[in-house]
Amino acid sequence: MSSYTLGIDTSNYATSLAVFDTAGEVVCAKKRFLPVKEGQLGLRQSDALFHHTVALPEMLAELGSEFDLTQISAVGVSEKPRPVKGSYMPCFLAGVSAAEAFALARGIPLIRTTHQQGHAAAALFAAKGEEFFREKTLLFHISGGTTDLLLCDEVKHIETLGTSSDLYAGQAVDRVGVKLGFGFPAGVEVSRLAAECDETIKPKSSVRGMECSLSGLENQCNALLTAGKSPAYVCKYCLLCVADTVVKMTKAAQKEYPGLAVVCAGGVMSSDIIRSWVQQRLPQVYFVPGQYSSDNAIGVSILAAREAGLWLK
């Protein structure tokens, strides 16, 4: 008999809810991006916390109109960005508050996890169902706040193998997009415009082993615009530089951890241009659908099911 779990994630980008059926199906998933004023690169934490506080009751009401929330057997929530000591962002307090209230009112277990583990769980589930929850995998998590190459052991233990020494890939993409007049986050619009460029581009990336530097990418893109290159060209160049970085870091990881599956997740990895470039060079790498790749609560709901003993017993 199926059981159902609720996942809640309140990142600095979006408010997300999801319901997971322990038969192995995502019943529903909802996401609302936080409003960012034109020309700005994100929100202050106090503003993000406010918007989550407003959005959560509305979104839970919407969810309740589509699914009987009295059937929920456990609730999961991301309480901080990463499963490491000192990791903290106030925006996650909104989700924790809502999850605690829901669990207490229903008398059901509350499972605390992290935003990064939620991303990992959603991506691994989308790539190969429960199989990747039983083994070690390499996960590339690239978003506005991460450019991390991770070693995942059943998502219970996550080790960072490599990262950016400065700017994150999502930050570089967003800064290029906002400079071109797009709203924040700008990844979707940057990818759309990049697809209009038919020119062959040779990207430049700065990678040493499993570590990278992306601060130069923003400067390169600004220089290209100043030199008269079209916005479409610059957007494509930016995305291909990220893709080339992924390829080089992945190859370095595969030398050290041969035989492990590689899964790509995070909002930046939703780009068709990045996916195409990477898979032409590393065809065995898994990319997952957008709703499992960008910010979501799907992974949190899945982890709630596992940790509550309702799934993968």
Each language-model region and where it sits:
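Glycine-rich beta-strand-to-loop/alpha-helix junction loops that act as flexible
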Residues: 77-80, 143-145, 263-271
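Glycine-rich phosphate-binding/hydrolytic loop that grips phosphoryl groups
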Residues: 119-123, 288-313
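A short helix-loop
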Residues: 3, 10-11, 18, 27-29, ...
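Conserved phosphate-binding catalytic cores of ATP/NTP-utilizing and phosphoryl-transfer enzymes
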Residues: 1-2, 108, 112-137, 302-303
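Short beta-strand-loop/turn "lid" adjacent to the catalytic site in phosphate-handling enzymes
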Residues: 61-97
